[in-house]
């Protein structure tokens, strides 16, 4: 996997190596060609708010946005799977300032929140969405499975980014995330609404 990180946020405390690791793991588990490319852009609140309006016509900042490029489907190495070669998956845009507030409300640290959002963004790059309830349940279940498996993989490799968190907020269901979104909307921080 070729993954580039562009940190334009000016926000301290973002572990770019961890973001590359979790994205590489998630895409590998989804059986995406090992030569596929993706990028992670780490931006400030104003930038993600502008992107949110421009691309989704939604006011206010958000935590993560994904911009797919080449349409790929999981299953590269299966005998009956698609055989696409290397391709540009797309861009994941993260806002650590917004994510930090969500992490606090969810009861875990920023690093975990950014790992969760990176997996979430990777699934959007692969065509997953959460528009209807069935899709939402499928996407969040897969997101949580990939994230938990990544923590297990990191531990098995003897790598330490942060401890694997526990509790409902660590591996949220779609309903948990909706509740968190509502808390963020009610927050008087001036961030406004959220749409992942």
From Swiss-Prot:
Segments passing through the bilayer: none
Cellular compartments per GO CC: cytoplasm
Sites where the protein binds Zn(2+): 120, 124, 130
Keywords: Cytoplasm, Endonuclease, Hydrolase, Metal-binding, Nuclease, Ribosome biogenesis, rRNA processing, Zinc
Cofactor binding, note field: Binds 1 zinc ion.
InterPro entries (UniProt xref): MetalPrtase_cat_dom_sf_prd, YbeY, YbeY_CS
Domain of life of the source: Bacteria
Compartments, as annotated in UniProt: Cytoplasm
Cofactor(s) for this UniProt protein: Zn(2+)
GO molecular function per UniProt: metalloendopeptidase activity; RNA endonuclease activity; zinc ion binding
The EC number(s) this enzyme carries: 3.1.-.-
Enzyme class: hydrolase
Gene Ontology BP, a term: rRNA processing
Pfam family, one: YbeY
Coiled coil stretches, renumbered: none
Function: Single strand-specific metallo-endoribonuclease involved in late-stage 70S ribosome quality control and in maturation of the 3' terminus of the 16S rRNA.
Family: Belongs to the endoribonuclease YbeY family.
Protein name: Endoribonuclease YbeY
Organism per entry: Corynebacterium glutamicum (strain ATCC 13032 / DSM 20300 / JCM 1318 / BCRC 11384 / CCUG 27702 / LMG 3730 / NBRC 12168 / NCIMB 10025 / NRRL B-2784 / 534)
